[in-house]
Swiss-Prot record:
It is an enzyme of class 1 (oxidoreductase). Converts 2C-methyl-D-erythritol 2,4-cyclodiphosphate (ME-2,4cPP) into 1-hydroxy-2-methyl-2-(E)-butenyl 4-diphosphate. Keywords: 4Fe-4S, Iron, Iron-sulfur, Isoprene biosynthesis, Metal-binding, Oxidoreductase. Coiled coil: none annotated. GO terms for biological process: isopentenyl diphosphate biosynthetic process, methylerythritol 4-phosphate pathway; terpenoid biosynthetic process. Binds 1 [4Fe-4S] cluster. GO terms for molecular function: 4 iron, 4 sulfur cluster binding; 4-hydroxy-3-methylbut-2-en-1-yl diphosphate synthase activity (ferredoxin); 4-hydroxy-3-methylbut-2-enyl-diphosphate synthase activity (flavodoxin); iron ion binding. It comes from Ehrlichia ruminantium (strain Welgevonden). This is 4-hydroxy-3-methylbut-2-en-1-yl diphosphate synthase (flavodoxin). Pfam families: GcpE. [4Fe-4S] cluster binds at residues 316, 319, 362, 369.
Length: 422
């Protein structure tokens, strides 16, 4: 009986891994030096707040996002001034060593005019995002859409067709709602709206292909503000198309709510092989930088094992066994030290982002967790001998004591990085 149970666990585990970690096939879309889709790493995106009216300030913001690790940065193209600023922002990025085509232009009904009026500025964009729900209205809608697509074809620029819950094509939504009302058992409204999002995205993409845009120049997104809607919509998209998918929870909110919602939805989809590029959209607190969105994207990818961006510091929460005065301070100091050193390590020590460091509070789980990491330190808890055991590659290396345990441990970290990542 026990053997049967063990065999079942092992078989179920293998099956789960086969399902969860198999990426869905998609076309590859090249945006400058970045490739979205195929078997390429999930791409991190962000959007600049902009709107300062100062091109130098806007350029600084885009640069900060790039320096934080955003591989593509979207900016709003909603005025003559906005589109004329694109070449300058691009040049700032190039001068700092970044991808010359990492800027994505995002516009609504006005973007067709701006691209046509300032083509030399639009050529500095790496990709253009258009929303079928507000690209135009009435008889101008299809013409505006086709003008953008033709510009993209002529200049070899990829397009993201981004449908949004808040600006869904009202004619399509009304028709689907009407048709649904005539059914014997109508679907709930939210189901109809989910279907409308997918239909809008796919029909727009197919229309772009009909105009002449190759499939490998198209990325799709369907943004909603609820996690279950996000999962449902993108699961449908993944089943019926091979376009790369841009994931994100729109209007996610701020603080813990926005972080949890975005992390839950994006992680679920990525772990089921759905999604090729991600953006987290949070409402900033006053004075908060949008670079936090980039860091959150990176943390999502690193926490689910899809990409590594930084040395991972593992630590326990602490309990009545630990000495919070020393333990919590050590955790804080190690995290800060790693964050400060990453820019140097990444250039001088390739692969260091795959390293793990464990900082543990007592003997209960400390030694075991430390042995799982590249380097680990197990602090003395209440009632334990006042020494900290250090483990390296699963073996005990030494014990530290005194008032400068942090400085001693940092020296060990630096030595490890220099030996194993060079």
């Amino acid at each position: 009986m026990q053997c049967d149970f063990v065999d079942r666990i092992l078989n179920e585990y293998d099956l789960l891994n086969a399902i969860v970690y198999r990426s869905k096939f998609t076309h590859e879309v090249k945006v400058g030096d970045v490739i979205i889709g195929g078997n390429n790493p999930i791409v991190v995106q962000s959007m600049a707040l902009g709107g300062s009216g100062d091109v130098y300030q806007d350029a600084r913001e885009v640069l900060e996002l790039a320096q934080a690790g955003s591989e593509l940065v979207r900016i709003a193209i909603n005025s003559d001034k906005a589109i004329k600023s694109v070449p300058y922002i691009r040049d700032v990025l190039i001068n700092h060593g970044f991808n010359s085509k990492m800027i994505i232009g995002c516009g609504q009904y006005e973007i067709a005019r701006l691209v046509k009026q300032y083509p030399e500025c639009a050529l500095a964009l790496g990709k253009i995002r258009i929303n079928p729900g507000n690209i135009g209205f009435g008889d101008k809608r299809d013409k505006n859409f086709e003008d953008i697509i033709e510009f993209a074809i002529k200049n070899d620029i990829p397009i993201r067709i981004g449908v949004n819950w808040g600006s869904l094509d009202k004619y399509l939504a009304a028709k689907l709602m009407h048709d649904n009302s005539l059914r014997g058992t109508p679907d709930p409204d939210y189901v109809v709206l989910r279907k409308a999002l997918v239909i809008s995205a796919i029909t727009s993409a197919k229309h772009a292909e009909k105009v002449g845009l190759p499939a490998n120049k198209i990325v799709i997104s369907c943004k909603v503000s609820k996690v279950r809607d996000l999962i449902s919509v993108y699961t449908m998209l993944s089943k019926i198309c091979d376009y790369p998918l841009h994931l994100g929870l729109t209007e996610a909110g701020s603080g813990v709510k926005g972080i949890v919602g975005s992390s839950a939805g994006i992680s679920y989809l990525l772990l089921h092989g759905i999604g090729n590029t991600i953006r987290v959209s949070l409402t900033q607190q006053p004075g908060e930088s949008r670079t936090n969105e980039v860091k959150l994207c990176q943390e999502i990818l690193q926490s689910i094992g899809l990409r590594n961006f930084s040395v991972q510091v593992t630590s326990c929460p602490g309990c009545n066994r630990t000495n919070p005065k020393y333990f919590h301070q050590l955790v804080s100091d190690v995290n800060k030290y790693v964050a400060d050193r990453m820019s140097v390590w990444k250039n001088a020590n390739p692969g260091v982002e795959n390293m793990t460091i464990a900082v543990m509070g007592c003997v209960v789980n400390g030694p075991g967790e430390s042995k799982h990491a590249n380097l680990g330190i197990s602090m003395p808890g209440y009632g334990e001998r006042s020494v900290a055991a250090v483990y390296q590659n699963g073996e005990k290396l030494c014990t530290l004591e005194g008032n400068n345990i942090f400085e001693q441990f940092v020296s060990i970290i630096e030595n490890y990085v220099s030996i194993y990542y060079h």
